[in-house]
Amino acid sequence: MTTRKRNEFLDIASEDEDGSDRGYDSEAAEESKGRFTKRRRTHTRADDLSDEESDLDVSDEDDERDSKAKIKTKSKRKTAKHGDEIATDDSSADEDDLQEDQYLDASAQPGSPSHTDSHTTTTTTTTSKPQKKKPLAKVKPPKKNKTGVVYLSSLPPYLKPFALKSMLETRGFEPITKVFLTPEVPSAAGPRRRSNKRKTYADGWVEFASKKTAKICAETLNASIVGGRKGGWYHDDVWNMKYLRGFKWADLMEQVQRERSEREARRRIEDTRARKEDKVFLEGVEHGKVLQGIQKKNEEKRRRQAEARADAEAAVAATAATSDAGNGPQGVKVRRLFKQNEVKVGRDKIKGDATLEDDTKRVLSKIF
């Protein structure tokens, strides 16, 4: 038997190293198992044929040549098929082949030419084949938003959102993705209807999946009656529609959020103002109550003083009346006179301008 100069199984191993970066694939693994079993069957069959050749050589030399020619042609075909199968096998079959090659080449010495040739061929094949790069996955561009928005400036009374959507879809304007209706705020001056709990909406927005559908809907239904069943609730109401060019649902939600935040801010300011006014009012009420209590106490004090003064005057008048009643007839007042005694003044307290008596003057004239 001639030794092989090129090891085909090692070449397949290098190809497997190139494809090892692709990861695990369950389908490829199942196919490789089937190919491995098929190849093992072909190996055993080739071995049996080689044994038959040796038996024929011993028995009959003439028949050996003919049988060898036939067997060689068959073996060439089988080896060609076998080589094609080897080129398509995966990593699991190649590892087994490498083990078999090592067993077959073990008889060859390291210094033999067959060994050196096989070694050089394997090194050249492993270094010559470049690695295949994976194609990059194509990034799909984001889908454009092709929706259209229609604005309804007025709506029929008590019309609900799902009823509006069904009315538009029955007329062929679909698909409708979103509907938003603004609830009507009742005026403070108007009468309050407590019995009717149905909601009314002031205006609304409808988003269609296609701009074309939105434009056709606005152009077709604008300034036309709602129609439908003749005795229906909304038969005679008129559509008021307008297609908003370049307007998206995100803009509407942003506007709604901004209006809601502004409304909440105004409500907070009004609440704080009302609380301050209530606080001032309560303080004024408390202060007024205190002043009323003080005034009430002062009035009671004045009233008590006036009553005491009146009682005293009445008592004085009563005593005077009783005293006057016993003195004169019929209560006539009598005038009484009292004699006053002259006050005696001492000698040392005589004034200088007082006149002296005649006796005293005579005595004094004699002395002085």
UniProtKB/Swiss-Prot annotation:
Protein's UniProt keywords contain RNA-binding: yes
Entry's localization field: Nucleus, Nucleolus
SUPFAM superfamilies in alphabetical order: RNA-binding domain, RBD
Stored InterPro entries: ABT1/Esf2 (IPR039119), ABT1/ESF2_RRM (IPR034353), Nucleotide-bd_a/b_plait_sf (IPR012677), RBD_domain_sf (IPR035979)
Keywords: Nucleus, Ribosome biogenesis, RNA-binding, rRNA processing
Residues covered by region (Disordered): 1-144
Keyword Hydrolase included in the entry's annotation: no
GO cellular component, one term: nucleolus
Biased composition (Acidic residues): 49-64, 86-103
Database matches in Gene3D superfamilies: 3.30.70.330
One biological process term in Gene Ontology: endonucleolytic cleavage to generate mature 5'-end of SSU-rRNA from (SSU-rRNA, 5.8S rRNA, LSU-rRNA)
MF term (GO), any: RNA binding
Amino acid composition bias (Basic residues), ranges on this chain: 70-80, 130-144
Domain (RRM): residue spans on this chain: 148-238
Listed Basic and acidic residues bias regions: 20-34
Reported function: Involved in the small subunit (SSU) processome assembly and function, and in the 18S rRNA synthesis. Required for the early cleavages at sites A0, A1 and A2.
Family: Belongs to the ESF2/ABP1 family.
Name of the protein described by the UniProt record: Pre-rRNA-processing protein esf2
Species in which this protein is naturally found: Aspergillus clavatus (strain ATCC 1007 / CBS 513.65 / DSM 816 / NCTC 3887 / NRRL 1 / QM 1276 / 107)
Lineage: Eukaryota, Fungi, Dikarya, Ascomycota, Pezizomycotina
Gene: esf2
